[in-house]
Regions:
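Extended charged low-complexity segments that act as oligomerization/scaffolding linkers
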Residues: 33, 110, 159-317, 321-334, ...
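Glycine-rich phosphate/ribose-binding loops and adjacent secondary-structure elements
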Residues: 25, 32-34, 42-212
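A residue-identity detector for tryptophan
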Residues: 2, 92, 134, 193, ...
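Active-site entrance/lid segments in N-terminal catalytic domains of soluble metabolic enzymes
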Residues: 1-109, 315, 325-437
């Protein structure tokens, strides 16, 4: 995605140049090498993006950012120190430990703005970090930060795209109180973790398709994730637990497509439309049209060479001419797949009887991977199951078609306890944080 956003495609700089209100970039999932980071900061600022932040999650990564800050001085950059209580992908590092171990080094750089996050879900907790009083618990003097990261607390804001049902679940989720006592004798003093593969307070700690630790709401989706992780670690169980896997997948927003070899060609097309429409991405419609073209090529009477489609016009034909000929355009597919399914059944009635042949069964995963945007279903039960299911899973929590129990939502286990309102304006939420400071 980096190449898509900032590399060869440069989507973000182009959007910024055209007037999009994007002023900053956060570099996460690792810290670039020194030379690369220096060049990156230079290029981003030249593109009109003045605020460049790095998000370290370990002591070594924090020190890497300090070296970067020294190399680009006096240019100001931000360091977002995130502890292991943050939502979504997380480390097992305590925020307080990270800050205490590196505070002097960070503060020695006048051009480094220190922001802390991960488990800061209430105004009172944020105030402790802004004032520096968080350090008193360790017998240390005030160690104030310049800002705090607010993530989970904004998930139910009026402006948040989170679906109403998921917002309700977030309010109902107790989470882990910030003053809770941990039973983990190895946990740092201030850490409140959900053990890997377990659930506490309505929160679960699982693995994403990247095989990285992830905090998420405990629901059918999280339960399915645990099963898939188990099978990933024990691939010999894939066949024996196939029925259980399919049942678990079908309770989530990303169900199993179905046993393609047992479907007819018409059922194949109908199932695709059922799971993918309304199209949340235009490439879903592209792949649906390619599927119909594959089916037509399979069932058409012509043995070889070209044939005249009974479904679609050639590219470039106007909508008026297409309608006059009784054929469909790509715009018709974008609007609604139903007419195409009806036309397929009428033009090729044999599609309701013919079973999908093995060559087309094998081709289907190729179609699914045709574009970068993953499809909203699992096309095949194989050893890549966790990736098929886990990719591109977060948008469903913003789509009212899907129940809160079926989607992956990723608040922090501490901060979720501080969510008490639904559809409160974000200005009011941030205002409460500001007032506490």
């Amino acid at each position: 995605l980096w190449n898509l956003q900032f590399g060869s495609s440069r989507i973000v700089p182009k959007k910024r140049a055209s007037g999009a209100p994007i002023d900053g970039v956060v570099v996460s999932a690792g810290i670039p090498e020194l030379d690369e980071a220096v060049e990156l900061i230079k290029n981003l600022q030249a593109d009109g993006l003045p605020y460049v932040s790095f998000k370290p999650g370990t002591v070594d990564q924090i020190r890497q950012v300090v070296r970067i800050a020294k190399a680009v001085a006096p240019t100001t950059i931000m360091i977002q120190v995130e502890g292991g209580e943050a939502g979504g992908h997380h480390s097992w590092e305590a925020l307080d430990d990270l800050l205490a171990a590196t505070y002097a080094e960070v503060r020695a750089c006048d051009n480094l703005v220190l922001v802390a996050g991960g488990g800061i879900g209430t105004p009172e907790r944020a105030a402790d970090y802004i004032s520096g009083q968080w350090a008193h618990a360790y017998g240390l003097p005030d160690m104030p930060v310049d800002g705090v990261l607010i993530g989970t607390a904004a998930m139910t804001a009026k402006e948040a795209h989170t679906s109403p049902e998921v917002k309700q679940l977030l309010v109902k989720t107790p989470g882990i109180p910030a003053d809770a006592k941990s039973d983990d004798v190895f946990a740092p003093q201030a850490a409140h973790w959900v053990p890997s593969g377990k659930s506490v307070g309505g929160m679960s700690s699982g693995l994403s398709h990247l095989h990285a630790d992830i905090y998420e709401l405990e629901n059918d989706s999280a339960e399915c994730g645990r099963l898939l992780v188990r099978v990933m670690k024990h691939p010999e169980e894939l066949d024996s637990r196939r029925k259980e896997i399919i049942e678990a997948l079908n309770k989530t927003a990303k169900p199993y497509f179905g046993d393609l070899a047992s479907m007819t060609y018409l059922e194949w097309a109908q199932r695709f439309a059922e799971l993918a429409f309304p199209w949340v991405d235009p490439t879903y419609a592209d792949r649906f049209q390619h599927l119909l073209q594959r089916i037509e090529a399979r069932v058409n009477d012509t043995d070889s060479g070209e044939f005249t489609s009974k479904l679609f016009t050639a590219d470039g034909v106007s909508a008026e001419k297409a309608a006059a000929a009784g054929l469909l355009t790509h715009d018709d597919i974008l609007a609604d797949p139903a007419p195409a399914l009806e036309k397929l059944a009428l033009a090729y009635p044999q599609t309701a009887e013919l079973k999908v042949v093995p060559a087309d069964v094998a081709w289907f995963p190729v179609l699914v991977r045709e574009y970068p945007k993953p499809m909203p279903f699992v096309p095949v039960i194989d050893n890549d199951l966790l990736r098929w299911w886990g990719q591109d899973q977060l948008w469903q929590s913003e789509d009212q078609r899907y129940s809160a129990d079926s989607v992956r939502a990723i608040p922090g286990p501490i901060s979720v306890a501080g969510i008490t309102t639904i559809d409160e304006p974000i200005a009011d939420i941030l205002g409460r944080f500001e007032a506490a400071m």
